[in-house]
Swiss-Prot record:
Family that this chain belongs to: Belongs to the HCP family.
Keyword match 4Fe-4S: yes
Species of provenance: Clostridium acetobutylicum (strain ATCC 824 / DSM 792 / JCM 1419 / IAM 19013 / LMG 5710 / NBRC 13948 / NRRL B-527 / VKM B-1787 / 2291 / W)
Pfam families tied to this protein: Prismane
Annotated binding of hybrid [4Fe-2O-2S] cluster, by residue: H227, E251, C295, C384, C412, C437, E472, K474
Descriptive protein name: Hydroxylamine reductase 1
Keyword Cell cycle: no
E.C. number: 1.7.99.1
Primary enzyme class: oxidoreductase
Binding site for [4Fe-4S] cluster: C5, C8, C17, C23
A single MF term (Gene Ontology): 4 iron, 4 sulfur cluster binding
Gene Ontology annotations for the cellular component aspect, listed alphabetically: cytoplasm
Main location: cytoplasm
Amino acid sequence: MSMFCYQCQEAAGCKGCTVRGVCGKTEDLAKKQDLLIYTLKVVSLYNVEARKLNLVNKEIDNYIVDSLFATITNANFDENIFTERIEKGIKYKEELKKQISAAGGNVNLNEKTEAVGVLSTENEDIRSLRELLTYGIKGMAAYLKHARNLSYEDSNIQGFMSKALAATLDDTLGADELVALALECGKYGVDAMALLDKANTETYGNPEITKVNIGTRNNPGILISGHDLKDIEELLKQTEGTGVDVYTHSEMLPANYYPAFKKYSHFVGNYGNAWWKQNEEFESFNGPILMTTNCIVPPKASYIDRMYTTGVTGYPGVKHIENGEPKDFSAIIEHAKKCAPPTEIEKGEIIGGFAHNQVIALADKVVEAVKSGAIKRFYVMAGCDGRAKTRNYYTDFAKALPKDAVILTAGCAKYKYNKLDLGDIGGIPRVLDAGQCNDSYSLVVIALKLKEVFGLNDINELPIAYNIAWYEQKAVIVLLALLHLGVKNIHLGPTLPAFLSPNVAKVLVDNFGIGGITNVEDDIKMFENL
């Protein structure tokens, strides 16, 4: 087999990609990523030993985080970057060995060098649990990277990441120990999302109810995609007064909800939809596009010269803006000045900004609506969007929900229904968008607040159903976080993860009520009877 990857929802045949990734990843790139993941596990093995001796190396901790983020689906397609990261990892391993040895520690660790890659673990269930843990750690890394960009860090979370990665090399750990580690990963996932929430809100203010323009103006523009709020802050500052407008795309939409960004008159609104439509939407935008994180779709020749990457992202032939304090966006700004204004593809407004602080401010109104029966049930429909036509299920599901149901969402899954006219209940919109995928944390805070207000003992007693669309590894850490918090009866779609072996899937079904989706009518009946 030339390659094997099943980390995302688009894994070929719900089994795995073996020739080329559906994402566009080549065999050579897949092998480089496998080798980098193995390198990170070995570095983590020594990092754990070093930490036992109070040898904490922030540079190595950050290297692990950034490298994991680069391997997330659709983040980086540049083989050279992975070669550099592998070489850097080998250097760090030797550094750690010297430090451990000098401190009298053990350097005779089992690096398991016989084989690398997913299939190097023969036992299907152990392999499944190791990958579940690895993908959760990848998702966590993304959130830690964004928090660190705003100078918020947590050494304990980074210590757990090394512990978890090292554990995937330990053949003495059985299924029970790995399940426990996965749930512990969920605990640290909550911590990571809380850290990022704190970083974002203390830096830019709490998101607030906002109507976001989805039309265009007649100035040239820059389209910023991905998740990194530090990047959009620096871009807005540097484009001010230049005659260049700024638009968000896909997961950057929630930047419009933050008070700190509303002062910029050239911050127009949001252009387009979820990541997978970018081939058409980047073409019609006419101006340059800045990818701050995933998701990159292999670009068309017609606009690749207008595309820029930054941070951990990369694509061969695409210009990369290096890190800096601040980053220098002058090249993309000058490029924009030479481009035509965006072609308008839609008009109107969408509403969002319902993160935990805003919803809790409306708590009295929400509680009264629940008590009066005006709101019968909340549906958490957070997660990711994707190319599969089966994802139209989520549009149909939103349309078919009874008028007394409210959707709580975060992540690009929202694009399946955030432009539908679903109305409101007593002034409360029936789609409450908390923000990016990491803002699933807000939905947890809201649920815990409602549990407190209603005096319930168990979060599962709330009238909340979980119908989550997943795509990549950030959705995995959100899932593990929910499981850690004791949330049960979560349904995942459009398919269950290919990396869950039948036995591991059974454990999740039996212990947590995890399920898939069937059809809209039957699923709504099922949720109403939970």
